[in-house]
């Protein structure tokens, strides 16, 4: 089975095993969420993709199949609420696993993710919303 990266990267090595050439072969329709995460969800569904540990020590493990399924659910929820390709979505979440699900979901839709820390002040949020011409806030 060809490694996923081999579809998108051509590497050449010399006799000493040193990389001598690297070429990126990224098609115009490349989508990390579909082409990598979902492909891993099909090839290695039970392999761990994310291990998240909360501030209270709570542990949550996501396999690639989980990440594929949950990002599909989130993408469908965003679409049902009007988010479409090209929309700018600012995401303000504490360090939480939901950030990664939302990231993959927006990637699948073709929306533009604008990450922002939850530690900003009101004036900072207002500035970002206006400067980025934000369509949606999470």
What are these model-derived regions, one by one?
Residues 7, 14-16, 123-124:
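Short acidic active-site motifs
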Residues 110:
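Structured binding elements
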């Amino acid at each position: 089975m060809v490694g996923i990266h081999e579809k998108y990267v051509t590497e050449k090595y010399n006799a000493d095993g040193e990389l001598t050439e690297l070429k990126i072969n990224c098609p115009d329709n490349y989508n990390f969420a579909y082409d990598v995460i979902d492909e891993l969800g099909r090839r290695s569904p039970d392999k761990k993709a994310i291990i998240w540990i909360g501030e209270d020590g709570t542990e949550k493990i996501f396999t690639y199949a989980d990440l594929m399924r949950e990002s599909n659910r989130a993408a469908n929820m965003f679409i049902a609420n009007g988010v479409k390709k090209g929309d700018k979505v600012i995401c303000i979440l504490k360090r939480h696993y939901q950030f990664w699900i939302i990231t993959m979901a927006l990637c699948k839709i073709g929306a533009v993710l604008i990450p922002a820390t939850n530690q900003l002040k009101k004036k900072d949020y207002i500035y970002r919303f206006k400067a980025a011409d934000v369509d949606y806030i999470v």
